[in-house]
């Protein structure tokens, strides 16, 4: 069977799997589990593969699941990855498949990622006698919370002998039929900083006798923006956001301490280093001016997701020739973080976005919103692109 004929047959079989995809996705949506707690989700995935007769490894790097599908002829080892953890958010959707777990929901589409990859695995397994190479399905736990599940799975051998990896994220603000993929950085390094300011408290009526931690902290918050505008090359991109400012005191008491917590985002490692150093320089200077002291910690989170050029071109070419794909665009890099970055630091590959906006505009909500949902037809698009990229990779 020619590769083009095989691809059409696989797409036809994926069409036949769509109702099962929806059923599986809705099951996960109703019974979500938080990062590092995905016991039942992992068990469901393992049971599905066992029903197909596909060899698996469980508890990979924690709760990860690996499935191996061997083609009938030698070829490259291609890995496909889907994450499966949920978020601590109360589901507010009025749909039959809304979360049944209070305070927990799939608000980022990981349920759809998993359902799509299971369908791909099923169809590849059914056609294994026509395939060249080995196909590794990586079902990853704990993407949402650092240190994440990718690195422990890699340390536990999930990429052993792997030549390339592909992954996707269903993107609920982009229309169905859209694929966004570009070489280079596509998602940012996501870091966290904590600043503790130690001043001198006192009565609100006597500010001259104090070292006001709230005033000092406020100046720090404002001055941090000067780093982005004056210390980072304008050709580069960076974000510094202070998300928490804590100085809990009665209304008439000047605070002696304040705690600032925020995030720094960047695409380039040199810029990342600049942000870490310059944040402390700002804190040190302002605290010194006021005669205050400070503690500063900077925690590096996931690195930037950086796509490899040749593999990205392959994915783009595949997507352009995939049924159901209406447009393939570069898109803009996202300031969100993703631990898929670790896979791409170890093997070649690419990460792309699959448009998944619900058909009704009033149902379109951003990721991590309590009313988040996807157009379930996007799972089929994602599955076809992933399968196509995987089975044709040996032609590169």
From Swiss-Prot:
Stored PANTHER family: METALLOPEPTIDASE, PUTATIVE (AFU_ORTHOLOGUE AFUA_6G09600)-RELATED (PTHR11014:SF63), PEPTIDASE M20 FAMILY MEMBER (PTHR11014)
Cofactor note (record): Binds 2 Zn(2+) or Co(2+) ions per subunit.
Needed co-factor(s): Zn(2+); Co(2+)
InterPro entries reported in the protein's UniProt record: Amidohydrolase, Bact_exopeptidase_dim_dom, Peptidase_M20, Peptidase_M20_dimer
Assigned EC number: 3.5.1.-
CDD domains assigned: M20_Acy1_YhaA-like
Enzyme type, top EC level: hydrolase
Gene Ontology MF term list: hydrolase activity; metal ion binding
Binding site for Zn(2+) 1: 182
Record key words, sorted: Cobalt, Hydrolase, Metal-binding, Zinc
Protein name in the entry: Putative amidohydrolase YhaA
Family: Belongs to the peptidase M20A family.
One Pfam family named in its UniProt record: M20_dimer
Organism field: Bacillus subtilis (strain 168)
Positions annotated to bind Zn(2+) 2: 144, 368
Catalytic site: 85, 143 (proton acceptor)
């Amino acid at each position: 069977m020619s590769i083009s004929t095989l691809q059409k047959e696989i797409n036809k079989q994926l069409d036949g799997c769509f109702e099962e995809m929806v059923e599986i996705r809705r099951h996960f949506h109703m019974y979500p589990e938080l990062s590092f707690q995905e016991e039942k989700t992992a068990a469901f995935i393992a049971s599905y593969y066992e029903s197909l007769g596909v060899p698996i490894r469980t508890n990979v790097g924690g709760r990860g699941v690996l499935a191996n599908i061997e083609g009938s002829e030698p070829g490259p080892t291609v890995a496909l990855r889907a994450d499966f953890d949920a978020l601590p958010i109360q589901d507010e959707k009025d749909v039959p498949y809304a979360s049944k777990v209070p305070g927990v929901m799939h608000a980022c589409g990981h349920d759809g990622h998993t359902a799509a990859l299971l369908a791909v695995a099923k169809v590849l397994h059914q056609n294994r006698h026509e395939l060249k190479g080995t196909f590794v399905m990586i079902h990853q736990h704990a993407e949402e919370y650092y240190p994440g599940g990718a690195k422990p799975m890699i340390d536990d051998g999930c990429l052993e002998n792997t030549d390339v990896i592909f992954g996707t994220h269903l993107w609920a603000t982009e229309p169905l039929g859209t694929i966004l993929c570009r070489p280079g950085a596509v998602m940012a390094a996501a870091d966290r900083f904590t600043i503790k300011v130690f001043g001198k408290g006192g009565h609100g009526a006597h500010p001259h006798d104090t070292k006001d931690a709230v005033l000092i902290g406020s100046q720090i918050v404002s001055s941090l923006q000067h780093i982005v505008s004056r210390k980072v090359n304008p050709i580069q991109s960076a974000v510094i956001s202070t998300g928490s400012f804590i100085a809990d005191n009665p209304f008439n008491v000047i605070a002696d301490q304040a705690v600032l917590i925020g995030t720094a985002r960047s695409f380039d490692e040199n810029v990342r280093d600049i942000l870490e150093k310059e944040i402390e320089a700002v804190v040190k200077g302002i605290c010194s001016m006021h005669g205050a002291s400070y503690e500063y910690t900077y925690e590096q989170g996931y690195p930037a997701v950086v796509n490899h050029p040749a593999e990205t071109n392959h994915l783009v070419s595949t997507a352009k020739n995939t049924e159901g794909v209406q447009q393939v665009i570069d898109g803009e890099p996202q300031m969100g973080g993703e631990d898929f970055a670790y896979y791409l630091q170890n093997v070649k590959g690419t990460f792309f976005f699959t448009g998944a906006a619900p058909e009704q505009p009033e149902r379109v909500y951003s990721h991590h919103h309590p009313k988040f949902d996807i157009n379930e037809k996007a799972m089929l698009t994602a599955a076809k692109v992933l399968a196509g990229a995987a089975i044709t990779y040996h032609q590169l």
